[in-house]
Amino acid sequence: MKVIFLQDVKGKGKKGEVKEVPTGYAQNFLLKKNLAKEATTQAIGELKGKQKSEEKAQAEILAQAKELKTQLESETTRVQFIEKVGPDGRTFGSITAKKIAEELQKQYGIKIDKRHIDLDHTIRAIGKVEVPVKLHKQVSSQIKLDIKEA
């Protein structure tokens, strides 16, 4: 019996796959637990339509990420921070991914989730720093920071 998997089933198939499985297994397990549905011509047509719309949405997200990358890599995009500095040249407060995301939103109107900013440790020194940011699975960029003494 041919089925379309609605969810991932370990060892059998992934969501959206059309596969031939034993009839008893399909009727007694997959269909009863709503893990799959019978692969009729109508169901296969619906699946193809869904896949096309998902691909289109993914392409749109990728295009937005690439546009954001060009904005971030522009020479004029440099996030400014003015911090109080101690006698040893280190800032009193530290600059975190959350702070970077907030300042980027405030100064340039660019909204990035703080979890996408790849900061190994908080920044505590003054100067110019570049921080990697993952915008999409296929697109990554750098955020330029300019940390100055107050």
Swiss-Prot record:
Keywords: Ribonucleoprotein, Ribosomal protein, RNA-binding, rRNA-binding. The keyword DNA-binding does not apply. GO terms for biological process: translation. Coiled coil: none annotated. GO terms for cellular component: ribonucleoprotein complex; ribosome. InterPro entries: Ribosomal_bL9, Ribosomal_bL9/RNase_H1_N, Ribosomal_bL9_bac/chp, Ribosomal_bL9_C, Ribosomal_bL9_C_sf, Ribosomal_bL9_N, Ribosomal_bL9_N_sf. One of its GO terms (molecular function) is rRNA binding. The keyword Ribosomal protein applies. SUPFAM superfamilies: L9 N-domain-like (SSF55658), Ribosomal protein L9 C-domain (SSF55653). Belongs to the bacterial ribosomal protein bL9 family. Binds to the 23S rRNA. NCBIfam families: L9. This is Large ribosomal subunit protein bL9. The gene is rplI.
